[in-house]
Structures are given as structure tokens and as C-alpha cells.
Amino acid sequence: MTPKRERAVVCLSGGMDSCVCAAIAARDYEPYAIHFSYGQRTEARELVSARSVAERLGFKDLLHLKIDLFRRIGGSALTDTSIDVPKAPAEEAAIGAEIPVTYVPFRNAHFLAAAVSWAEVLGASKIVIGAVEQDSSGYPDCRPAYYEAFQHLIETGTKEGSIRVETPLIQLRKREIVRLGLELGAPLDLTWSCYSGAEEACGECESCVLRLRAFEEADAVDPIPYAHR
């Protein structure tokens, strides 16, 4: 008899990092995906990617949650159309030097809280999220200390049991994430990282620039279409 696998809830945005995390979870656990539509510019495109990735990897279920508070609060170029999404700095080294306008205030705490709630219901022991500190835009909710603090909150505020937050990519460089994804057979062709909602990725926002650079440094070809490379 095959041993019963631990269940894991994966925060699946549809982006490259969450896709690689999904591939890790599909390898190691019985995986369930949770996806959030929160008024972001790329809401529809991200949902298509998340569903496609979950299906390709054989996830048991995908829970799609709609959250209105970020759109109503505003303050981020991702949720407030009055704030332009900036192009990446001319000098790539400047990316992450300061918190950009694409930061959604305290977003990951809300995502994690919902994931923990569902994990309790499912009896899942793991929450997997694709936070990345290296080669990133400098978001404060993508640092190891943030997840260590949230782990303590889970242990304090949930019923008896053991739910752990896993951040398998947090210390990896982007090129290492690409290589890992290719090694695992992660469906990177289904992902979407761009902050634009156009048919093709813009190739000019910070997210696109970081992704394109990662594929180049990994000696690989990014399989998604770009308006500018």
C-alpha cells in the first residue's frame, strides 16, 4: 500500500516562482492550490495561468478567492490604475534598492492567513509560497524574518496540529529558480510574471526584466511571448 502523502496548500499566483513551488509540492506532497484575485491589473491572466499550472501538475483542487480590500485601499500600481506601472530602472543593479510602487501593502499576510485557514480544514501540514529575497524588487514581505514571524503566529493562533510555512526559493537567485524549474519539469510555458495585462508580456517592467535576465543567466529560453526582449 502506498503511504498517504502529506497535504500541502500552495499559494499559486500563476507566476514563475509559484510555478516552481507548485512543481516541488507536486513532487513531495498531495498538493492543493489557492489563488487570489485582488483587483490586480493582470487578474484574469493570472487566473488562467494558475489554473493551467495546477491542472498540468495534477493538483487535487484549486481554491479561487476574490479579495476586494486591496483595490479599495489602493496605494499600489498593481491595484490602482491611477498609478502607472514603471519601467525597470536603466541600471538593473538599481532594482530592489527601494520599495517600488508595485508593492501591495501587507499582501502576503492576507494570502497566508487564507491559506492557513484552508490548511486547517484540509488537514494540510504545509503552506508553500514562492517568496524570493534574492534578485527581487525589494518587497518587505519577501524576507525570511517575515515568514519566521508568521510561523510563530500560526503556532499561536491555530488549533492543535502542525502547519508549517515553507519558502523553498527564498534564498535562491532567479537563475537558480529557472534551472530548478527546468529540472523539475515545471510548466514555465504556462506562467505569467508581467505587471501588464496585455496579450504579450511587456518585457520592460521590473518583473519582466528580472525574469528575462534569469533565463539568460541560466542559458535557457523563456517560453512566453514578449513585446520587447
From Swiss-Prot:
GO biological process: queuosine biosynthetic process
Cofactor section: Zn(2+)
Annotated organism of origin: Acidobacterium capsulatum (strain ATCC 51196 / DSM 11244 / BCRC 80197 / JCM 7670 / NBRC 15755 / NCIMB 13165 / 161)
GO terms, molecular function: ATP binding; ligase activity, forming carbon-nitrogen bonds; zinc ion binding
The protein's Enzyme Commission number: 6.3.4.20
PANTHER family, sorted: 7-CYANO-7-DEAZAGUANINE SYNTHASE
Residues binding Zn(2+), per UniProt: C194, C202, C205, C208
Reaction catalysed by this enzyme: 7-carboxy-7-deazaguanine + NH4(+) + ATP = 7-cyano-7-deazaguanine + ADP + phosphate + H2O + H(+)
Keyword set includes Nucleotide-binding: yes
Family matches, as Gene3D superfamilies: HUPs
Keyword Cell membrane among UniProt keywords: no
UniProt-recorded name of the protein: 7-cyano-7-deazaguanine synthase
Source species, domain of life: Bacteria
UniProt function note: Catalyzes the ATP-dependent conversion of 7-carboxy-7-deazaguanine (CDG) to 7-cyano-7-deazaguanine (preQ(0)).
Co-factor remark: Binds 1 zinc ion per subunit.
Family: Belongs to the QueC family.
EC class of the enzyme, as a word: ligase
Keywords, alphabetical: ATP-binding, Ligase, Metal-binding, Nucleotide-binding, Queuosine biosynthesis, Zinc
Binding site for ATP: L12, S13, G14, G15, M16, D17, S18, C19, V20, C21, A22
HAMAP family: QueC
Pathway(s) where this gene product acts: Purine metabolism; 7-cyano-7-deazaguanine biosynthesis
